[in-house]
Amino acid sequence: MTSTTPFRYQGADGVPLAAFRWATSDPPRAILQLAHGAGEHAGRYREPLAPVLAAGFAVYAADHRGHGLTSGMSHLGDFGPGGAPACVADMAELSKLARAENPGLPLVLIGHSMGAMFAQAYLLEHSGLIDALVLSGTTGPGPRLPGGPNSIFPNPRTAYDWLSRDEAEVDKYIADPLCGIQFSEASMASFVALRSRELSVEALAGVKRGLPVYVFVGDEDPINRRLEGLEPLIAAYRGAGLSVTLKAYPGGRHEMLNETNREDVVRDLLAWLEAHT
């Protein structure tokens, strides 16, 4: 049975953040720290990660600034004056907390979508805090699809068909009042600026060499432009000495943990985690 422990912790600048600890065993075999995506919240991941929890991993998951229980309904989409860099710093503070509460256990950072891109920025300054990195629904820097993410799918049923082929999961996202939020202009600008150096040779020079990295995506994900956007990311990480495994699922869209083949996706993720912790 999964235990849920809600808590709050302070970011580096003192801002309180809402978070959860999920676990099925005490002590756990390893720690998984989750960074959720844009326009959603950490609570969406408890069910998809249930097999990982059952295998003995504990999960620490926080709602970013401008999201979920951290912001409340009145401030959704606004990172605040610290912008996107503050969100990355918050992740490092949560890593330190998870390590302090679980001394000696491996710590794996998993980020999805915006959370994966935050993780890519985190990597440049804080790779020493983690033992492995998992990126879901991510991409390297590059242009967005001019028609928006739904534009590659003919006759979409909803504005969010690009998330998953599973209509029930798309409908759950649409019905969730904490999902589908729009960013403030300042928050979006800070996010774009954050990504400007993530693949430079100089920026990657200080990253822990040999760090295991697992990237799993759908090959119909418009965020990575059907895998095109991943090529520079994978090349840069391998060039920096990281041990990268790429798993691309045929037909998969953006949220592979909520896709029609999610059982296979989670099984593959768990196998990789068990091999690297």
Residue map of PLM features:
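Short beta-strand element of the alpha/beta-hydrolase
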Residues: 28-37
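Active-site glycine-rich loops that stabilize anionic/oxyanionic intermediates
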Residues: 36-40, 113, 219-220
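N-terminal cap/lid segment of alpha/beta-hydrolase-fold proteins
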Residues: 1-24
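Alpha/beta-hydrolase-fold enzymes
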Residues: 110-183
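Short beta-strand/loop motif that positions the catalytic acidic residue
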Residues: 215-217
